């Protein structure tokens, strides 16, 4: 059954709330669903309690608590992620369990930016969250308008420090709680009927306008991680896997990238799904790709098939990493430079050597750290690629490539 249609009239965008504990991320998330629901019968309201007791999910062997809500505006459909705990944010952003096309940074006007505000902005920069919109919350608790200006200036400075365009980022001032209380009193409150509800609309407008609709996976250059390889007598070698992005059809040139000393170029002579011929395989399809003139020995699990020139093999990179705590099934002890675990990229493990940054002697379970890795074999890498760190098959950490070195 190819190409079942999921009918969606509006473009889809993934967002999430980030920011310091108790600055109002979850209250704002609830308010967004209520406000959007008043104008759109398709939106399901979620209350603070529904969001706060976020279900556990697993991503790359790590347990994370994450709440997912959905809402829509006249222009777009949104999936929104909110995490109850600070550690959940770190794990979520590093594993990419909840990819964000843009983030809503919540800052309490009463406190201004706090340590986790900074940490979440840094994480957003490292893991490649491309856009941030700011909601300055709890402005009803601040009497002095100059103080509000000061907090806004501090937030913009902080964004600039981490290479976000702090001077251009929209900053909306409001009170998530007062908006939510109004929606509880009258769930049908519309735009223009209450000043605090209007602030939530102002935020929705800013998200609509400022965060661009992302390029769909299917429109990106073709890439398929190889999961398995077999031979069809008389026809040649087939590589199977799930297409990560782009599309592929007979006659396309592709490269086999990674693990081997040389990147090899070949031509696709067939694309199959469940033993039936496909006109074209697209992102998300599990397919077999028949490769011209390639022997069974020349392609293996862990390599990728990709559009020529779109991705290259590398051995050395910098990464942002979360190291699992003992209670999460991680190591019981710390590790030093020279540590040699396996790095699991897409479909395979490759051994690598860790080099800690200057001034860091040792990394403990539960830490979030940036370090350099040198792999013993080249792998198809790019910035933003997620991986797991494993020892003997069990996950001890999760990371994201932040910079390619060689």
From Swiss-Prot:
Location of the region described as G4 in the Swiss-Prot/TrEMBL record: 137-140
GO cellular component: cytosol
UniProt cross-references to SUPFAM superfamilies, sorted A to Z: EF-Tu/eEF-1alpha/eIF2-gamma C-terminal domain (SSF50465), P-loop containing nucleoside triphosphate hydrolases (SSF52540), Translation proteins (SSF50447)
Region of interest (G1), ranges: 19-26
Subcellular location: Cytoplasm
Residues of the tr-type G domain: 10-215
Gene Ontology MF terms: GTP binding; GTPase activity; RNA binding; translation elongation factor activity
Chain intervals for the UniProt region annotation (G3): 82-85
Posttranslational mods: Phosphorylated on a threonine.
InterPro entries, alphabetized: EF-Tu_GTP-bd, EF-Tu_GTPase, EFTu-like_2, EFTU_2, G_TR_CS, P-loop_NTPase, Small_GTP-bd, T_Tr_GTP-bd_dom
Reaction(s) catalysed (UniProt annotation): GTP + H2O = GDP + phosphate + H(+)
SUBUNIT field: Monomer. Binds to the 70S ribosome, contacts tmRNA during trans-translation.
Family: Belongs to the TRAFAC class translation factor GTPase superfamily. Classic translation factor GTPase family. EF-Tu/EF-1A subfamily.
Name of the molecule in the record: Elongation factor Tu-A
Source organism: Thermus thermophilus (strain ATCC 27634 / DSM 579 / HB8)
Gene from which the chain derives: tufA
């Amino acid at each position: 059954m190819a190409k079942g249609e999921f009918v969606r009239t509006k473009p889809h965008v993934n967002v999430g709330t980030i920011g310091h504990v108790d600055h109002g991320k979850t209250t704002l998330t609830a308010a967004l669903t209520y406000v959007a629901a008043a104008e759109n019968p398709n939106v399901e309201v979620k209350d603070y309690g529904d969001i706060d007791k976020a279900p556990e999910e697993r991503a790359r062997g790590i347990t994370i608590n994450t709440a997912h809500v959905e809402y829509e505006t006249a222009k777009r459909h949104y999936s929104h992620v909110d995490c109850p705990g600070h550690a959940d944010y770190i794990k979520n952003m590093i594993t990419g369990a909840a990819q964000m096309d843009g983030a809503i940074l919540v800052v309490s006007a009463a406190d201004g930016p706090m340590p986790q505000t900074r940490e979440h902005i840094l994480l957003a920069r490292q893991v490649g969250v491309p856009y941030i919109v700011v909601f300055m919350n709890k402005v009803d608790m601040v009497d002095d308008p100059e103080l509000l200006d000061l907090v806004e200036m501090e937030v913009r400075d902080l964004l600039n420090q981490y290479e976000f365009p702090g001077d251009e980022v929209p900053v909306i001032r409001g009170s998530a709680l007062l908006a939510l209380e109004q929606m509880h009193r009258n769930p049908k409150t519309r735009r223009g009927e209450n000043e605090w509800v209007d602030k939530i609309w102002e935020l929705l407008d800013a998200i609509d306008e400022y965060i661009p609709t992302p390029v769909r996976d299917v429109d990106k250059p073709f890439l398929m991680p190889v999961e398995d390889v077999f031979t069809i007598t008389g026809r040649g070698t087939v590589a199977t896997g799930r297409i990560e992005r782009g599309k592929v059809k007979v006659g396309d040139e592709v490269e086999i990238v990674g693990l081997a000393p040389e990147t090899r170029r070949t031509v696709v002579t067939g694309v199959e799904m469940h033993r039936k011929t496909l006109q074209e395989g697209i992102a998300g399809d599990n397919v077999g790709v028949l490769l011209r003139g390639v022997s069974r020995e020349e392609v293996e699990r862990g390599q990728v098939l990709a559009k020529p020139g779109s991705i290259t093999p590398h051995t050395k990179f910098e990464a942002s990493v979360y190291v699992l705590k003992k209670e999460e099934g991680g190591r019981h002890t710390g590790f030093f430079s020279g540590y040699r675990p396996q790095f699991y990229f897409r479909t395979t493990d490759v051994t690598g050597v860790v080099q800690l940054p200057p001034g860091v002697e040792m990394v403990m379970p539960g830490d979030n750290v940036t370090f350099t890795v040198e792999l013993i074999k080249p792998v198809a890498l790019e910035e933003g690629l997620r991986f797991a760190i494993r020892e003997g098959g069990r996950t001890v950490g999760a990371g994201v490539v932040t910079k390619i070195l060689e």
